[in-house]
Amino acid sequence: MEKMMDEFKRKMIHDGKSDRTVEVYVNSVKEFFRWFYDSYGNVEYKKLYRENILEYKSYLKNIKKSSHSGNNLCPKSINSKLSALICFNELVEPDNIVVSKKDLIKIQAEIVSPTSITKREIEEFRQIVLQAEGCAARRNFAIVTILAYAGLRISECLNLRKSDICLESNQLRVTNGKGEKARIVIVNSKIVSAVREYQKTDRVESEWLFHNSRGERLNQTTINRVFKLCCPKGYEITPHTLRHFYAINAVSSGIFTIPEIANQMGHSSIKTTMRYMNPNLEEIRQKVEML
């Protein structure tokens, strides 16, 4: 099985999948094989069978428990595991396709609750990051600014290469987006200024825009630590909070069309973007008083 997993990993890397995707998919497929041998004993694995896929899907839906909550897996988690098997099937057993996207569970889109973080609080957080001690302050400030005002996923931000950003044209190129989709994101002057000032102090040779002192791509653990240290008391700000903030504010501004926001955020469907079109309760309250 090790040889097969090495082949799977190698082919994913060759296809340009991100390190995170490779890690998650490898772990998910290994989990399938653990279930396979637990279920069928010492029977030698030959190939994927449709019957096994359906039984595994039933196991995920009805028996498998979340390691975090102890409850049944949510549809999103099940789909993540099935997506790994779809990829494995396509890359390792391309002549034996027995699982596809049709097997994914349809998820009812939920309205995203309004963010409780205001722009003032985001700006306070950004300033704390900028004023933090250490040579990495400007780097971290640039990262936080991109997350808040371009809406990138943290993985997309940390995967940016220096060649991916063009300050003169106010745009950056995301090449390792979710689903491995590439896109161009237009950025504002806050981001241009933050990145430009960071680059003035960056003396390390590296292909990565955001890197450590050895020139290696920055990892998410480091950024999570920055958020924890700099987040004002009483606030709960994470990288995803900033992406959420961007989406809510882009939608509520009325300046952008939904397809424009979907492109900026890398949503494959505008239905995902429309989840952020929830009503502003304060505005409704004011309108009700006018009746």
Positions of PLM-derived features:
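Basic, Lys/Arg- and aromatic-enriched nucleic-acid-binding interface segment
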Residues: E124-I154
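Conserved tyrosine-mediated DNA breakage-rejoining catalytic core shared by Y-recombinases
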Residues: A150, N159-A194
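DNA breakage-rejoining catalytic core of tyrosine-based enzymes
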Residues: A109-F125, G179-S189, R203-S206, Q220
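Active-site/catalytic core of tyrosine-dependent DNA strand-transfer enzymes
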Residues: N188-Y235
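Catalytic-site neighborhood detector that most strongly recognizes the C-terminal catalytic loop/helix
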Residues: S116, N176, M265-M290
